Structures are given as structure tokens and as C-alpha cells.
């Protein structure tokens, strides 16, 4: 969320229902940012909790007061890079075709605006 807040992109957090969970997932959160061309939100980040589903198959355990227990695991997509680039372009594109660079990225881009070629 912090990344999307710094980029000032419209977003929301979705708690997925049981029918949308994949094999072994116990709980899943998605962060979706607005795509103006599609008039809908699209996933940019995902975080899933698997309890011990994956670690049982991998035999990843820890010892708790002498008792072996399986660890619990998470699976996360830190950022869907191609999609977030599209969302930045779409949300920051101006009527003349230029693209404002989000403030948080200006130091890395070395400019404030990407202009169209004339």
C-alpha cells in the first residue's frame, strides 16, 4: 500500500473470498490500482497465507520446546511491474499525450514530464 500511496495512484485492498483462493491458500489479499482505459481496478500486489500446506511438502520444520512443528508460509507478489507501469502512464497521462512523472519517481527519472515527440 505504501508504494501506491507514494505514487498517488488510486487503489483498494481486496480480501479474496474462499472461491477465489488457489490450492492450499488459507487467506489472500490483493491490492488493485485503477486502470482508466479499462474503467476498473487491476491487481498490482498479492499476498497469500498457506498455513503449513507448502512447508509439509518441503518438510520445513522448527522445534518448539522439543516438539517438531511445521512452519507457516506466505507467498507474495511484491509488484506486478509491467502492470504498474501501465497504471502510472494511464493515471498520469495529460491531454497533450505527455506523462507527468509521479513526485516519488522524479529523483530517479531526472525529469518531471515525459513529452511526446513532435
Regions found by a protein language model. Name each.
Residues 1-118:
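TRNA-recognition modules of translation machinery and tRNA-sensing kinases, especially anticodon-binding
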